[in-house]
Each structure stands twice: as C-alpha cells, then as structure tokens.
Design a protein with these regions (language model features):
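Bacterial Sec-dependent N-terminal signal peptides
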Residues: 1-25
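Auxiliary tRNA-acceptor-end handling modules of aminoacyl-tRNA synthetases
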Residues: 23-63, 67-307, 325, 329, ...
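The catalytic-center signature of Zn2+-dependent metalloproteases
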Residues: 339-362, 424-431, 435-481
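Extended catalytic-interface subdomain
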Residues: 370, 375, 381-389, 430-438, ...
Length: 814
C-alpha cells in the first residue's frame, strides 16, 4: 500500500511538471517589445547645442554628433595638435598627425574610416582595382546609431569615448610615448574640455593624462598631462588642380605614388602646397592681356585681438609686403591683412574657425614665430594657416639686430629699442613667416648670390636688399662698415621671392591638367637659369646654402663681421647699462657676440670638404655637384688658424668679465675652438676630402692637405719656439682628444632626415685613420725636438701631449 502511494505521488509529480513546461509563460505574454529612443528622448531640453558642420549636442557629460546624411562619404581632414603642454614637453601648437577620414553608414552603425591618398590610379584603368585592394580603408572607430534626426535627414551618434578614451591617432604621438615610457591612459585624470562646430570644421579639445615611468624631469606625479586639439576639416568637393613640384624652385610639397602612369615602374609624383588663387571668369581676357586682376578669393589674414595695438600695423605690413610678389603672378590685392570683427560686430567670429587664417599672438617666453599651414592631401590646396607669434620673439630680434648692426647703427645700441625700430623688425619676421604660409620653404642659397662688397653699397642694397629672398636666414647686414653710409640692413621681398610666387601661382589658362603646365613651368625656370638671384638652395653640405650668412665669400664676409664685433665689445658696458639694473643684459649681449663669432666660424669651416649643389635637369649643361676649389678651401683653413685657433684675445675683456662671472673665459674659448675643430674633423667631411682627391687628383684639397694645415696651425709654437699659453694648451689637448675619437670610434647611424646632409663612411675601412696616425707620428717627432727648449709649464704640457699620443698609438686595435 505504501509503495503504491509512493508510485502514485511520483507519477502525479512528473505529470504536473510536464504540463507546466508546456504551458506558455504569462509573464512573457505581457512583456512589451523594447521601445527605441527618439531624438527627443536623447537630446533633451537641457542639451547645449552648437550648430555647424555637424550639429554638436552636449547632454550632461555626454557629447553627440548629429551628422547630416549628405556628409556621409565626404572626405575630411583630421589635424591633431598638442595645444598645451607641461613644462619640459616643448611648447604647444605643434602638429602631430594628419589623416583623411570618411564617415560611413553601415547597417546600424556609423564607421569612421581612414582614407589614404598615398597610392592612386585612375578609376578608368584596370590597375585601379589592384590599388583599391591594397589600399583598404581601416576603421578608426565604430559608433552605434542612437537615432535619426528630427526630420530624418540626419543621424545621431555619441562621440564621448572617441575623445575620452585613448584613440592613439588622436592623442599623444606613438613615437614620443616610447621616449617617456608611457604605459596607459589615466582615465580618471582625462576629460573633454570642449567640442565646437563651425561651418567647415569641428574643433575638439581634450585633456589627456598618461601614466609614465619616465616623465619630464620636473614631473613628480608619474604622469604626463597635455591638452590635445583635433581639427576635423571638410575637404572641398572638387579638389583644386595640382601644380607639379620642381626641385629647382623651393616649395613645400607632398608626394603620391601613381600606378596609372604609362611607365615601367611605380612613380612618385610631387605637387605643391598652395592657396587656390583663381581668375574670375569675367576677368580672364584681362588676365590674358597682362592686366592685374583680383582673384576669386583673396588670401586674408586676421590679426589676433590679443595683439598689442602698437604692433598690429607692422604685422599687417609684413603680410601685405607679399602683394608685390603676387603681382608677378598676375594678381592684385591677392593677400590682405585685416583686424577681426569685435565681439559686438560678430559674436560668433573665432580664430578656430577654419575659414579664417589668423596671426595668433601668444603670451609666451618662447623666442620664436612660425607659420604652419593645413592643406588638402589630394591636391595640395592650402585650406588655412595660422601664424604663431610668441611675445618673446622680440628678444630674439633685439639680440640679432644688436650683435649684427650695432657697430654701424645707433638704433641698435641698447637693450630696449624704440617702437619704430622694433616695428620694422617685426615687419621683417612677419613677412618671413607669411612666406611659409603661402608655400615657400627656407631658401638658404639665396644670400650667396650677392658679392660681399655689394652689401657695403647703399645703391645696391636699396635696390636689392641684403638677399634675393626674405626666406633665407640672412638676418641683418653684418658686413657693412661704419663708413658705409645709407646701406640697407635687412632683406625685403626679393627677386627670388617674386620668381617663386610667379612660378607657383600664376595661372596657365590654356593648360587643362597639371601635366599640361609642365612645359611652361620649365620655360619660366630656364629663362633665369644663369641668374644666381633666381637660385634655390637647401641647407646641407653646400657651403653656399647656409643659415645666418651673407655674401658669396664666407672668409671675406666673416672678416668684416669680426671687425664689427671688435667694435662692439669695448662698448658693451655702455650700450647695455641702465641705472638700478644688474649686469644680466651685459652677460646676455656678450654671449650674443660669442654666438655670432661662432656663426662666422661655421660659415667658413663648411667650405672645407664642401660640395656645391646646383639643381638641374637633363637638358641643362654642367654638373649638379662640384667640390669647392682647392685654393678656397686652403684660404678657409688659413682663416680658421688665424682668427680662431690663434687665440681671439679681443674677446678677453676684463672690464666685462669681472662683472658677469667669477670664472669661465678659458673654458669658453676652449669650447668655441673645439666646436669648430670637431666640425673640421668630422667623419663625413673627411670622407668627402678623400673622395675629392680620388676624383680630381692634384687639383683637390686633400685630407692630408687639410690635416697638415690644421696641425701646423694648432701646434704653431713647435715651429716658432714660442711659449704655449693656457688657451693654446687647452686647444692642443682638444685636438688630441678628437684624434683619439677618430682612432677609436665609428660613425653613428645617420637619421633619415639627415641623409642628404651627411656623408656616410666606414671609418676603419677608409684612409681617415691612416692619415690621422701619420699626423700623430709627425707631431711626436716635432714635440721631441721642441720640449727641451720650453718653459716649465710648456714642458709639462708637452709631456702630457706625448703621453696622450703614445696612448692613442698603442690603444685599441685599428
């Protein structure tokens, strides 16, 4: 009975469980499908909205983009800059990354894709398919679609994480992360500062804090914080017609590999960065007839509201000085300067709006100014440019103008200039920086076009300035002497500047494509191929393309410059004095004198082992590269022996030294001499001397010639039987230290940016050490002959020199 009851109970239990499993859930029947949020549910009345390229909505701590559907597929340029940094990281404003992006709608997501224009082929060619297959657009970020816009013509996405998370292309550059050993983003100390929308761009600012095991030395937090600015700029629907680059005319350019060309290799094409200056349709006939016309759209620069009023007109003058160059291109009033509207006139005007190019005045101790620009990578069209003008650039200008012209120019004799004088200097730098913003790089070869003595002529310099290009680092006229009355002291927009602007900007109406323009562009270059004033030269191994130099003969120019420095030094106390102030200005300007002297030594020493570089094409006669003549190299070595290695005692002015330091002059002169000594005994320079002899034989200034001349100059006392003073003893020991370096070290790896400026050599498999040993053996014999006829200090010094020589000779294997 009991068993039957148990059986009955179990049967009923199983039956009830089975029936329960088959019965539908009442709860599931009553559950409603999840309702999708509407635009109004997400973008509430509390939202802060900024209308522009995308409408931006901020709801509490969340940011949303409302993207008009017509903008999907359009290409946009993302420019990432470091806006603000902590001390030790470098100053803000520097461009870190640029990428072309495309917003794509894919099912229920929005994709932000990276577009590359580095490799292309015409879409009408079969090879285009291969290019597309190898040029897949990676996805930078993916967003969920939150809702449609109110009128269903736009799409809403949340972008908070795009800027609050560590999206590397939009943050601190990967290359610099390694140096500071950054491990991760510290999200608790990172946040979005602002996102603002303008008609053609969106500006996002966010503070990023990174955990770092090797932060700048002044950081005690174990982190690095900086403010990042991302500019997303809508690119034109129709790219501007390109103009192809030619190395004979200096220009900022970009390159692209075109697989669609009818050649048997992949070929890189370079094209200019330049503003879109076009002739109005109604003015085309006037233009063809040689009349100047106003372009469809002018280049306009606004002067930052923060700029001190007294400097504004000079900044404007520097901008509009370029009008004369654009007239060569056929345009009048092509570039103009304006004050921005007041806040009352236009409360929405902002320097961050990409439609406006602005000279930004930055309250910073940095002695600098720069002129970067943003351009369309598809065509090179410059879209916008802001000149960063740091307040302390005036200190730099004062120092240059003082040390280079005070000997002949009363206006420069002081540590504070009249406003008119400083204004002229500001105008000069303004014009230089504007040159960068219209596409022109530095032309370091410009100043060597003028004969040195022409720079002492008032007639010549008033007509031509001090250099054919304001884009050279020609600075001010240090060659002019006190008797040269009325001579110009600084460059203007010159012959080369007009030539380059004409070449880069003058429209060629009959040319439909960039390729069609090439014949005309080549002719414009060939028309002036024999004119040094029209030459472009980039800094490198070419001694005629140097920074801070003037004239066609570095020796002669430097001799004039040193004469002026010798005039300045005795007057430094008087020209820097001010009652109630200490001697810090005296110390600064004395340091400037030594720096200027070092520049002269660099100008001359660059000729030793120097090679001239004159860009040419196949249809032009003559070599591209030519070694500096033997006679001139020897002249340069003699100059260095006389002016530098023979102690420059004119620097040793006790009336200055006893006011600025308790010690240091012996080390200062040693440092000045050893800097140039090490430059002369540079592996690359020595390798070029060897190659010069191999190619040109007896007409070359050889490595043995140079080393012999150097030894005889530095060890002159051995042959004249004079006492060796402390300055010369220091120099001679520096010489032996450098020879020891040559005998034991190899040339370091050459960074990619320097490969066009440095000659590579395997030192142990060259004649360099052979010649160095030969010089040491000769020197050893000469010391033995001389030391017994010397005073006690000289004898002790020569004993030390002999010990060093022996150590070098029996040192490491060679």
């Amino acid at each position: 009975m009991f068993k039957n009851n148990i059986f009955t109970f179990l049967f009923c239990l199983l039956l009830s469980l089975n029936l329960a499993a088959q019965k539908p859930s009442t709860k599931e029947d009553t559950k409603k499908p999840k309702k999708e949020k509407t635009f109004e549910d997400i973008i509430t009345k509390e939202a802060i909205t900024d209308k522009g390229l995308f409408d931006i909505h901020k709801v509490k701590e969340k940011y949303y983009y409302e993207i008009n559907d017509t903008l999907f597929g359009r290409e946009m340029l993302m420019v990432t800059r470091i806006a603000k940094t902590a001390s030790g990281l470098g100053f803000g404003g520097g461009k870190q990354n640029t990428q072309v992006l495309r917003w794509q709608k894919k099912d229920n997501k929005i994709l932000l894709r990276v577009v590359s224009h580095n490799v292309v082929a015409s879409d009408s060619l079969p090879v285009n398919e291969a290019v597309l297959n190898s040029n897949f657009e990676p996805i930078l970020y993916s967003f969920k679609i939150e809702s449609k816009g109110i009128d269903s013509t736009s799409t809403l996405i949340e972008v908070t994480k795009l800027f609050s998370e560590d999206v590397k292309p939009l943050g601190f550059p990967q290359s610099r992360r390694k140096g500071y050993k950054i491990s991760s983003l510290n999200s608790k100390k990172s946040f979005i500062e602002s996102i603002k929308s303008y008609p053609e761009n969106i500006e996002s600012r966010h503070v990023k804090t990174y955990n770092s095991s090797s932060p700048p030395s002044n950081s005690s937090t174990g982190t690095i914080s900086l403010e990042i600015n991302n500019s997303m700029i809508l690119l034109p629907k129709v790219p501007m017609k390109r103009r192809y680059f030619d190395q004979r005319v200096g220009w900022f350019a970009r390159s692209q590999v075109d697989y669609g060309l009818d050649v048997q290799e992949s070929k890189s094409l370079k094209y200019l960065d330049r503003w879109r200056l076009e002739v109005k349709d109604e003015d085309l006939e006037k233009f063809k007839n040689g009349e100047l016309v106003t372009p469809k759209k002018q280049i306009v620069y606004y002067i930052d509201r923060a700029t001190p009023v007294k400097w504004r007109k000079y900044l404007k003058q520097g901008i509009e000085d370029w009008q004369i160059a654009f007239e060569e291109a056929g345009f009048k009033n092509a570039i103009i300067a304006k004050d921005p509207p007041t806040k009352e006139e236009d409360p929405d005007w902002s320097p961050e709006d990409v439609r406006y190019s602005v000279v930004r005045y930055l309250a910073s101790p940095i002695p600098n100014a720069n002129g970067p620009h943003v351009s369309d990578p598809r065509s090179g069209e410059i879209l916008e440019s802001d000149i960063n003008w740091y307040h302390n650039v005036m200190t730099l200008l004062r120092n240059w103008f003082f040390v280079q012209t005070a000997a002949i120019n009363e206006d420069a004799r002081g540590v504070s200039f009249d406003d008119e004088v400083m204004g002229r200097l500001i105008r000069f730098v303004s014009a230089h920086e504007v040159g960068h913003t219209i596409g022109l790089p530095h032309n370091m070869g410009s100043s060597s076009a003028y004969p040195v003595d022409s720079l002492r002529s008032a007639t010549f310099t008033k007509k031509y300035g001090t250099a054919p290009s304001i884009m050279d680092y020609a600075r001010f006229n240090y060659i002019a002497q006190p008797e040269d009355k009325g001579v110009a002291l600084m460059p203007d927009i010159g012959v080369y500047d007009k030539h380059s602007v004409r070449w880069g900007y003058r429209p060629i109406p009959d040319a439909k494509t960039a390729k069609d323009e090439k014949k005309t562009l080549d002719k414009w270059i060939r028309d002036n191929e024999n004119s040094l004033m029209h030459r472009f030269g980039s800094a490198g191994i070419d001694p005629s393309s140097q920074t801070e130099d003037l004239g066609d003969d570095a020796v002669k120019a430097s001799e004039y410059g040193i004469l002026n420095l010798k005039r300045i030094v005795p007057n430094l106390n008087k020209w820097t004095s001010e009652d109630g102030k200490d001697y810090s200005d005296l110390q600064t300007m004395y340091g400037q004198v030594l720096s200027q002297f070092n520049r002269y030594m660099g100008h001359v020493s660059s000729n030793i082992g120097g090679v001239y570089q004159y860009y040419k094409t196949y249809d032009q006669e003559g070599p591209v590269y030519t070694h500096v003549k033997k006679s001139h190299q020897k002249k340069c070595m003699n100059f260095l022996n006389d002016q530098l290695f023979e102690t420059p005692t004119w620097m040793i002015d006790n009336n200055i030294l006893n006011k600025i330091e308790f010690a240091g002059i012996t080390n200062r002169i040693r440092s000045t001499q050893s800097r140039t000594l090490n430059s002369i005994l540079d592996f690359g320079k020595m390798a070029r001397l060897i190659e010069n002899e191999a190619i040109n034989g007896k007409t070359a200034y050889t490595l043995i010639d140079m080393m012999s001349d150097l030894k005889e100059g530095i060890w002159k006392e051995l042959y004249t039987h004079k006492t060796i003073d402390v300055y010369r003893r220091n120099l001679q020991l520096a010489y032996l230290d450098r020879i020891s370096y040559i005998m034991n070290e190899e040339q370091g790896s050459i960074p990619s940016w320097a490969r066009g400026r440095v000659t590579s050599v395997k030192v142990s498999q060259s004649d360099i050490r052979t010649v160095a040993i030969g010089q040491l053996l000769e020197l050893k014999k000469d010391i033995k002959k001389h030391k017994n006829r010397s005073d006690k200090m000289t004898k002790m010094h020569l004993d030390m020199a002999m010990a060093k020589i022996n150590k070098i000779l029996v040192g490491k294997p060679i």
